C-alpha cells in the first residue's frame, strides 16, 4: 500500500 516501497513497515 505504500507508494515508494514494498515494505508496509516503511511508509515513504
UniProtKB/Swiss-Prot annotation:
Q: Which GO molecular function, any one, fits this protein according to its record?
A: oxygen carrier activity
Q: What is its main location?
A: secreted
Q: Could you tell me where this protein is found in the cell?
A: Secreted, Extracellular space
Q: Which GO terms describe its cellular component?
A: extracellular space
Quick check: keyword DNA-binding in the entry? no
Which keywords describe this protein according to UniProt? Copper, Oxygen transport, Secreted, Transport
Q: What is this protein called?
A: Hemocyanin subunit 1
